[in-house]
Amino acid sequence: MQEAPLMLKNKTARRIKDIPGFVFPGGVKVIINFTVDFDAMIFRKFLREPKLWCAQGEFGGRTGLWRLLDVFGEFDVRTTLFLPGQTGLLYPEVLRRAVREGHEVANHMWDHHIPPTLEEEAVHMDRTDTLIKGLTGQYPAGTRSEHDLAALRDHAYTYVSYTPQGEFPFYVYYENIGKWMLKLPLSFIHDDAMFFYFGW
């Protein structure tokens, strides 16, 4: 077991702790975790842009996620959809289908940015959590967002999946809120957003 002090952006010390004796269940050697950041249209629809511009961003909600769910169903794969709340307002039907088919829906901010104040951040988190509960019947278990620690303290998330810090799950202890959080690393290399950042 290793513990190492690190510094966060807000100068708060934390400790990282590997999960002792961690093994995947059932003798599995490798696990691939499929997640979808369902960010469709949040940068366009609410800006009241011209219709032709908006049409470029409609694919994810009108077609893309539906097709992904078809593929996941064909291969009996369950995944996690990280949802900005505004996207949930725009495309509730595809999310209801995802829930019916056993997929998890988790918090990915309200409009894909972290507000400048804790008060606004708490409002955004609550709005997204409430919307997800309305769609799924339960509050989300995790988040993919760089939320302030003080904001995380008041939410019942069991995991955070935001940074590519390793290959295996691990725990992080946040000193100023006295709470351990499970970290599920991600890989930006396999994130298709990398290919589109400069085109939008």
Regions of interest found by a model, annotated:
Residues Q2-I189:
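Catalytic alpha-helical scaffold of carbohydrate-active enzymes acting on polysaccharides/glycoconjugates
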